[in-house]
Amino acid sequence: MRMSERKIIARSLSRRSALALAAASLVGAKAAHAHHGWSGFDSGQVLRLNGRIAAMTFDNPHGELRLTTAGGEWSIELAPPSRMVARGLSREMLALGTDATVEGYPHRQTARLMRAERIVVAGKTTELR
């Protein structure tokens, strides 16, 4: 292989690598923005929901509840599990069928989606933020 052919191949690989890296960066940035973009929630409107836990995840990046209320079912975004545990809220406290009160901000566009600021379970209030 001649020197000029090697340069063309090296340039081609460099361009492909650069494009692949750029594409991966954009995907990662979009995912991070989608998850961490709390601006979609209306912090000027605080809601207080009372209901029963119908489903729960206690996983990273944050826990989630499905809360059945008199007005319908809500999806509740909680804090990361490590923060909840550090503040005294365990996975066991969020068992299915448990009554809970959640205060937080509704999503501006998605109906019945809330970012929780605090949760009350069995008379214990846990600050999530």
Regions found by a protein language model. Name each.
Residues 32-45:
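Short boundary/loop segments of OB/S1/cold-shock single-stranded nucleic-acid-binding domains
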